[in-house]
Amino acid sequence: MALPSFITKIKSRVEYEFKKTLYRNLVFKGGGVRGIAYMGALEVLEETGLLDNIERVAGASAGAIAATLVSFRLSAHETKQLFLSLDITRVPQTIDNGKKNRLPLSEENACTRRFFDRYGWYSSMYFYRWMESIIGLQCDGNRRATFADFQTYGFRDLYIVAANISRQRTEVFSAETTPDVAVADAVRMSMSIPLFFEALQFDGTQFGAGDFYVDGGLYDNFPTHIFDKEQYANWAFRDNINWETLGLFLRQEQSLQDREPEIPGDVWQFLTLAARNLYHSHQMSAYQTNPVDKHRTVEISDCGISALEFDIEPGSERHKQLFDSGRQAVRDFFEIDSRRSPRKKIVETIKEHVQAP
């Protein structure tokens, strides 16, 4: 027998309030330029009150950028403004900032030299300087703030994933594991898409020596497992799974089978196409075979936009589509009725149905 409608609504409200207070850890999947969708998702998480309860954030690649911004404990609007201060069109840089060539080089020649000397076509220097400046704004001018410094400032605990290709393993940078590493350094490594951006040698203190690192998404683009330890849960820890973790996962709007075939016109286009397929196949395979993650993950449509479309500008239709996609995905996950305030308490629902004439 079906439950009375008001009981069904009360049950739904209880489940909603439970979810809102359950989550303590937030994980962002990598996604390139599509990270703007996370800003839309954050707005709704804030509206529900869920964002206030988050204690730890983690991410790889673009997810590492989002996680770092969220760690500052700013409002969703302030976080979005910081994100929008990054000029995405300048991120793939052909000429390094502050460096002059002895001989005049065309941009293509500079990229070719970088590709053979530093194993990547573009420089990530513009992004790196932007990340340092954002951190400096939040850390009293200290652009080189470390993970330990972030703890001192009372930020959310931050976990950044990068791929150490010298040792063929994922490395997690955090106050627990690498307290003295500058956060900007870790984020730069995490977003360095192999072959697209220069590979980075890092010795734990500075670039230019040590192991080679690239985009964290190469090995682990959706690191929800980081928090699958009892120490990161208050009570909802069962069978080595932390149910207090919520993931934000950018998924492809179209399957690869439904897309028009892409025919590369040169070696660089081929490498870009191969990298995109590698990331997609590896991460989707891992996600689809993990039923646990599906139950603790908000799936956000990428609106058919590639991770490497660096020509997206704020205010454009594609930019708005991604932002709205993030908002709607969170609403769908929590089954939020846009006509009702997400902050209504269950007692109001009871009064509405029980005391109605």
Language model region names:
Residues 1-58, 68-357:
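Patatin-like phospholipase
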Residues 59, 63:
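Gly/Ala-rich beta-loop-alpha elbow adjacent to hydrolase catalytic centers
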